[in-house]
């Protein structure tokens, strides 16, 4: 059943239970009737089987399933303004409930520009951040630079060159 009531919300139900809701601002909710996050797509659930997003690929080749995060410096969709050094391109954000909300930061993985971009040339780095006990924000713990060097708990390179690092 599709309910397009006068409140600007579209609701999809099956077997008498609401399954999907589109809010008047275009946000899509799955598994809940109100949005507690500011994202365009929010999936809510009570167990691991119904509170995730899945991408699967079935093909007889080496191509994977994928998740694409991209960024342009333009404020107009469809315009592709070049990024700058240190621009954050994508982030995986991990949060948890602290008794008052579900927004306390646990950890982040960020992908950022690590140099000067050129035509089909986008130097990148990955950084891994965690929240210490008693803190409310994350701290960078590990960085993989665009040249392959790795920094642990500092922005300074701790190991460079070819070879194997064993800890």
What are these regions (language model features)?
Residues 1-105, 113-167:
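Trimeric beta-solenoid/beta-helix "fiber body" segments of extracellular/virion adhesins
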């Amino acid at each position: 059943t599709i309910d397009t009531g006068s409140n600007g919300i579209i609701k999809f139900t099956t077997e008498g239970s609401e399954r999907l809701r589109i809010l008047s601002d275009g946000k899509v909710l799955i598994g809940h009737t109100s949005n507690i996050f500011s994202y365009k797509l929010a999936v809510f659930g009570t167990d691991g089987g119904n509170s995730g997003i899945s991408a699967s690929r079935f093909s007889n080749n080496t191509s994977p399933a994928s998740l694409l995060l991209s960024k342009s410096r333009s404020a107009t969709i469809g315009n592709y303004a070049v990024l700058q050094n240190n621009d954050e391109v994508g982030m995986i954000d991990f949060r948890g409930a602290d008794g008052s909300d579900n927004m306390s930061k646990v950890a982040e993985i960020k992908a950022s520009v690590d140099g000067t971009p050129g035509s089909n040339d986008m130097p990148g780095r990955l950084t891994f951040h965690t929240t210490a006990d008693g803190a409310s924000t994350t701290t960078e713990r590990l960085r993989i630079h665009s040249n392959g060097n790795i920094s642990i708990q500092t922005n300074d390179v701790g190991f460079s060159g070819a070879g194997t690092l064993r800890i």
